[in-house]
Swiss-Prot record:
This is Interleukin-22 receptor subunit alpha-2. Keywords: Disulfide bond, Glycoprotein, Receptor, Repeat, Secreted, Signal. Disulfide bonds join 110-118, 238-259. Residues 1-21 form the signal peptide. One of its GO terms (biological process) is cytokine-mediated signaling pathway. Belongs to the type II cytokine receptor family. It is found in: Secreted. One of its GO terms (cellular component) is plasma membrane. Residues 26-68, 100-161, 162-263 form the Fibronectin type-III domain. One of its GO terms (molecular function) is interleukin-22 receptor activity. Transmembrane segments: none annotated. The record marks 99, 151 as: Critical for IL22-binding.
Amino acid sequence: MMPKHCFLGFLISFFLTGVAGTQSTHESLKPQRVQFQSRNFHNILQWQPGRALTGNSSVYFVQYKIMFSCSMKSSHQKPSGCWQHISCNFPGCRTLAKYGQRQWKNKEDCWGTQELSCDLTSETSDIQEPYYGRVRAASAGSYSEWSMTPRFTPWWETKIDPPVMNITQVNGSLLVILHAPNLPYRYQKEKNVSIEDYYELLYRVFIINNSLEKEQKVYEGAHRAVEIEALTPHSSYCVVAEIYQPMLDRRSQRSEERCVEIP
């Protein structure tokens, strides 16, 4: 017969081994590289499977929360130390009643999803406020711990697309019309909201003389209509543009080249 102290030691060892094994399993299920990817305020939460997961053997659960660094004095007052960022009447704005919200909320469309991403654009539309997202995985009846994103503030972190260009030839010159990217919000009259409503933007226009293989910046400013003059007849030119955000010292990628022949 096994002595009592040996049997007790066996039970303790068995229990600790089981706990360690369970913790190891949970850790290996935990989603990796959980982060927001944002373009033009389309805010997508993305992640990678845990080390133990392959294929479609698991499902994921997504939560999010907004973190305001202020507190409400009363339900009728603006939070102390806070300020209203934007005065507008389209769905991208939130009322002051939203200030102070800190609870994790389920994203119903991504609750039990097999995808590795979740669109949180609508849930993160207070663009100057910080957010967090988190994801947990489940497989074969086991659940991982939550894996959380770094702090995400859309206004600071979204990347904007290059401008859309329309080019028209006018008496040997080129008239370039630039359009800033639209956002996923709309005004009440169904008018698209532009990135210009949120940032000071400068447009940069470059022209390339194909015969000389030489690029020249011909414009930098806030106007969206740019005329390029003094072009050489019977020559080929290409035009590209980008957007620069002075406050963030950040620029977009360049647009696709648009090429024309000057008669």
